Amino acid sequence: MAKKVQAYVKLQVAAGMANPSPPVGPALGQQGVNIMEFCKAFNAKTESLEKGLPTPVVITVYSDRSFTFVTKTPPAAVLLKKAAGIKSGSGKPNKDKVGKVSRAQVREIAETKAADMTGADIEAMTRSIEGTARSMGLVVED
């Protein structure tokens, strides 16, 4: 018989840097999960990613307090900021442009995010990432 699902916990944790402090500790502690066990497993799974990159994770907690988790790709905004070499997006994206990204970089980000996005094809996903870039105050160049 399958285990009964108690809760789904969605978090954004820095790759390779999960520790029992907030937000991880309180979110998992409420569900009765062994926090250190999660931290060790998460850090081992995200070893290949750049350390400190915010990584969304969905943790499925079962009624016997065991858990499984699935890591997603980092948010498009984070990948765009990294590609453009900026700290943050623009507060007024229509007026103040803070950086530039090439279409090739946008396409590369779309291909990275393809596993998590529900776009019809790579072109649609690329357009979606371009929209995110524009809303952050980035200029998309050919």
Swiss-Prot record:
Keyword Acetylation: no
UniProt KW keywords: Methylation, Ribonucleoprotein, Ribosomal protein, RNA-binding, rRNA-binding
PTM annotation: One or more lysine residues are methylated.
CDD domains tied to this protein: Ribosomal_L11
Listed GO MF terms: large ribosomal subunit rRNA binding; structural constituent of ribosome
Biological-process GO terms, alphabetical: translation
InterPro entries, sorted: Ribosomal_uL11 (IPR000911), Ribosomal_uL11_bac-typ (IPR006519), Ribosomal_uL11_C (IPR020783), Ribosomal_uL11_C_sf (IPR036769), Ribosomal_uL11_CS (IPR020785), Ribosomal_uL11_N (IPR020784), Ribosomal_uL11_N_sf (IPR036796)
GO cellular component: cytosolic large ribosomal subunit
Pfam families membership: Ribosomal_L11, Ribosomal_L11_N
Matches recorded under NCBIfam families: L11_bact
Family: Belongs to the universal ribosomal protein uL11 family.
Subunit and partners: Part of the ribosomal stalk of the 50S ribosomal subunit. Interacts with L10 and the large rRNA to form the base of the stalk. L10 forms an elongated spine to which L12 dimers bind in a sequential fashion forming a multimeric L10(L12)X complex.
Protein name (Swiss-Prot/TrEMBL): Large ribosomal subunit protein uL11
Lineage: Bacteria, Pseudomonadati, Pseudomonadota, Gammaproteobacteria, Enterobacterales
